[in-house]
Amino acid sequence: MATKGQTLVNTRSKQVIEFLTTSGDSNGNLLEMVSSWQPNAPEPSEHYHPFQKEYFKVYEGELTVKQNGETTIYRATEMFEIDKGIVHAVWNASGKTAKVYWKVKPALRTENMLEIRAKLSQKGMFVTKFFTRLLLPIKYRKELRTGKGSF
């Protein structure tokens, strides 16, 4: 279980996440993080959250966001939200580091899922196929699903 101040490193997504407020801190109501993406991070698989809404504020750099097939670039000081059920992908396609405030409501087990992804990436496991196609649909069905949104 994640703790306030804990940092995760996902070598595959080129992402570092620091937990500000965890599910345990908020009785499951929210998860708050600061996420930093290294330059030229790979585009992740599109997915959606059936029961969660995400909020982002770009502190530094820029993020590329694909929602329902449309791509938008958000820059420092800009904010955006992703409603539950919206198919999306978020990554740093730019040549500079991106730093973002990221909030997920409700938290559910998102922090645990992020911890597992980070551990798998550090072990050099092919996270995309193994994790998103086999483990995610079963263990984290309430948190994340791949494919088309249905909500």
What are these regions (language model features)?
Residues 32-36:
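Short amphipathic
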Residues 1-30, 41-52, 57, 62-151:
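Jelly-roll (double-stranded beta-helix
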